[in-house]
Amino acid sequence: MLLEMLNPMHYNITSMMPEVMPVATMPILLLTGFLLLVWNYEDTSSIPGPGYCMGIGPLISHCRFLWMGIGSACNYYNKMYGEFMRVWICGEETLIISKSSSMFHIMKHSHYSSRFGSKLGLQCIGMHENGIIFNNNPTLWKAIRPFFTKALSGPGLVRMVTVCVGSIITHLDRLEEVSNELGYVDVLTLMRRIMLDTSNILFLGIPLDESAIVVKIQGYFDAWQALLLKPDIFFKISWLYKKYEKSVKDLKDAMEILIEEKRHRISTAEKLEDHMDFATELIFAEKRGDLTRENVNQCILEMLIAAPDTMSVSVFFMLFLIAKHPKVEESIMKEIQAVVGERDIRIDDMQKLKVVENFIYESMRYQPVVNLVMRKALQDDIIDGYLVKKGTNIILNIGRMHRLEFFPKPNEFTLENFAKNVPYRYFQPFGFGPRSCAGKYIAMVMMKVVLVTLLRRFHVQTLQGECIENMQKKYGLSLHPDETNNLLEMVFVPRNSEKCLER
């Protein structure tokens, strides 16, 4: 009996608690422990940013991205917390960086070559471990990229000049198709059709309905922007994402019909052309077993949507800037006359068009279309003194960086900003390094071709003094004009008309 009384296991510890501990003490200890965990979590990162605050911080930051759009949210947080700061997206730590030294480090190194985004969202649009734009399968991405690089450089780039000039002339001769009853030109639609037509001739080579495909591309792009950062729960509520799923399916179905026609032509051709285009190269890679049919279809889709999605909007913004800055237009026209004269532009003119080139650069700096780059850290690293852990998401706010460092008049549109050579670490419209834009060279050449060919023929004017600064825009994955605005059309005045000659 005595031994049992001395044995601590003899007692019911739970029943003894009230005797040795006040009732309120346990909740206080639990709360203290929880707050200590939260405090320790926040203390693990010295990077500026909103507080964790028992999980409320991550929830608020993700909601802000969904509500404001990626671009606006990034600018908000950089302005609030500095040029190297931390938030959370989908509960994952995410850095937003607009500091040139940090961007240079990230773009330079291969352990930042992966991107991030909702897996379910990327699966819905066909980009999860597929294509090139958001493909995070490093082995497949490395196998696919050479097809894009080959098609977008060398002989393909040279051929693009002739093809693009022909497409522009054809579409300018049919301006009534993209003009309203007052003769105002829907420039966005015009540019999208030119870009799609040029891309199709170069990379696929199958006749298509430009008008219908352009609409489907816009639907696909809207779905891409909407789904990229959505939480997983969004995809469990079918009525929320069905319209986006349909938009993706519409474009994929249309593209599949075109690609099947391409396969048929290849299989029935007696002799292949000496120069195989992008689609043919991919289809032969599929026949060798290097790629799947799904890989081929997604790569061709991405190749055809790239220019109508981004470059067309870039040229649209450029034409608005030209309309507002007559002295810039005058300088451009003098150079065009001196270099090109009355003939069509050629590939050997490109290096001589310095004013046009600086205008393109300044337009992309002042009013970017793609102003964000999304990456993921594949290993632990130190960036500008901050520890960046493996798996950390990173958004490079390039558009903001272009207005913070180096340029003498960062908040003005002026060619003075490119009067001197700009070190490439301070100006990255296409990125650089292992994951830079595969089409950066052909994009520059194509924009020169479009501007020279169009401006030789027309002087452009906006409606009611509409300008870039006052234009309603959507700040998402890329920056686009709000197309519900009624003042996005332009007036094209023929250069040889009396109205233009009187200027």
From Swiss-Prot:
Keywords: Endoplasmic reticulum, Heme, Iron, Lipid metabolism, Membrane, Metal-binding, Microsome, Monooxygenase, Oxidoreductase, Transmembrane, Transmembrane helix
Recorded metabolic or biological pathway in which this protein acts: Steroid hormone biosynthesis
GO BP field: female gonad development; lipid metabolic process; response to estradiol
Cofactor: heme
Species annotation: Canis lupus familiaris (Dog)
Record's subcellular location: Endoplasmic reticulum membrane; Microsome membrane
InterPro entries: Cyt_P450, Cyt_P450_CS, Cyt_P450_E_grp-I, Cyt_P450_sf, Cytochrome_P450_Monoox
Keyword Isomerase carried by entry: no
Name of protein: Aromatase
Catalyzed chemical reaction(s): testosterone + 3 reduced [NADPH--hemoprotein reductase] + 3 O2 = 17beta-estradiol + formate + 3 oxidized [NADPH--hemoprotein reductase] + 4 H2O + 4 H(+); androst-4-ene-3,17-dione + 3 reduced [NADPH--hemoprotein reductase] + 3 O2 = estrone + formate + 3 oxidized [NADPH--hemoprotein reductase] + 4 H2O + 4 H(+); androst-4-ene-3,17-dione + reduced [NADPH--hemoprotein reductase] + O2 = 19-hydroxyandrost-4-ene-3,17-dione + oxidized [NADPH--hemoprotein reductase] + H2O + H(+); 19-hydroxyandrost-4-ene-3,17-dione + reduced [NADPH--hemoprotein reductase] + O2 = 19-oxo-androst-4-ene-3,17-dione + oxidized [NADPH--hemoprotein reductase] + 2 H2O + H(+)
Domain of life: Eukaryota
Binding site residues for substrate: 309, 374
Functional summary from the UniProt entry: A cytochrome P450 monooxygenase that catalyzes the conversion of C19 androgens, androst-4-ene-3,17-dione (androstenedione) and testosterone to the C18 estrogens, estrone and estradiol, respectively. Catalyzes three successive oxidations of C19 androgens: two conventional oxidations at C19 yielding 19-hydroxy and 19-oxo/19-aldehyde derivatives, followed by a third oxidative aromatization step that involves C1-beta hydrogen abstraction combined with cleavage of the C10-C19 bond to yield a phenolic A ring and formic acid.
EC nos: 1.14.14.14
